[in-house]
């Protein structure tokens, strides 16, 4: 296995231009495929998850043209349902942002499609989405373990009244919302339990609006969707920078700035993970917002106790930032860490202990007390891009850190370590 040793970083300063958002990129690709007319997507993320979506769309007969650097994509929309004549198997890696929406999309009309992926994908639950789609008439079979991929999707979803559990992943609701306007009948989606990661639903609704479809909802509990609608291309769509990826550079500035300015997101961003900057501010960092940037300056950091259900990905960065804050930090209401690329609660607790932190791992929370001095460690990344990027922050101490399998950042930010190095200064 490859490894990367990061030597202690004494100072962080500069500007980072963010790659496109994974969440926005894959939603936009699917809506562009559904839409009437061609759509030119710019600042598309070039990463493993996006490649899986692009490969799947190509296999399903959607034509598109990519720029040489893969950040601009012109998609020829089909103006309706995505159907495929004859059986086909689509391999989606560990891309939840491809698996969940495509499951719903391919339930429209008639299909004969198998959706599969890496071993970890087969451990990530999808039963709540399948249950909801079946309520609307879809025919879906589990090919291995009940409630988990791989799936055999045959179509049949016509809409109607559907109940979906909101407690595990907002991607289930996103998948239903994007597919429902194309169903034969009107749909009424009822949320059971507390809806996690609500800002990600706002991303979905904003994107759908850009493609001509508006959805009404009652306090995120019941969503009303007219059937037999058509998505219409906006012509051009600019993909925002990835707010989750911004978190590492903003946290680095809070710990060892200098000042870091992140461009590609701003005060009017679609993404809930921009709220991460507000959390850093509560901890003591200095934050400044512009229309298309956010800037962080070093401050004296103190621990916090917060519900971070709305920013689960960026909350991971708070867990490693806590190593540099006075007192304990508690991150609450994050059960859905357990069903991400790995069981992130267990992984985070395990690796934080390696660097000397005192950690209490609860079912849906983590309590972190930093050590007087961080210990050198080899950090396991669990094939999880965010684990690798979060633990790079350990190098902001006077202790080196070794990141195992650093290439796993290719899922969302292939160039991450080069960009971190560009902003870093070390004692000569």
Swiss-Prot record:
Positions bound to 3-phosphoshikimate: 22-23, 27, 169-171, 197, 313, 336, 340
Cross-referenced InterPro entries: Enolpyruvate_Tfrase_dom, Enolpyruvate_Tfrase_sf, EPSP_synthase, EPSP_synthase_CS, RNA3'P_cycl/enolpyr_Trfase_a/b
UniProt keyword annotation of Cytoplasm present: yes
CDD domains: EPSP_synthase
Protein name from the UniProt record: 3-phosphoshikimate 1-carboxyvinyltransferase
Record-stated family: Belongs to the EPSP synthase family.
Subcellular location: Cytoplasm
Molecular function GO labels: 3-phosphoshikimate 1-carboxyvinyltransferase activity
Matching PROSITE patterns: EPSP_SYNTHASE_1, EPSP_SYNTHASE_2
Active-site residues (renumbered): 313
Catalysed reactions listed for this entry: 3-phosphoshikimate + phosphoenolpyruvate = 5-O-(1-carboxyvinyl)-3-phosphoshikimate + phosphate
Species name: Photorhabdus laumondii subsp. laumondii (strain DSM 15139 / CIP 105565 / TT01) (Photorhabdus luminescens subsp. laumondii)
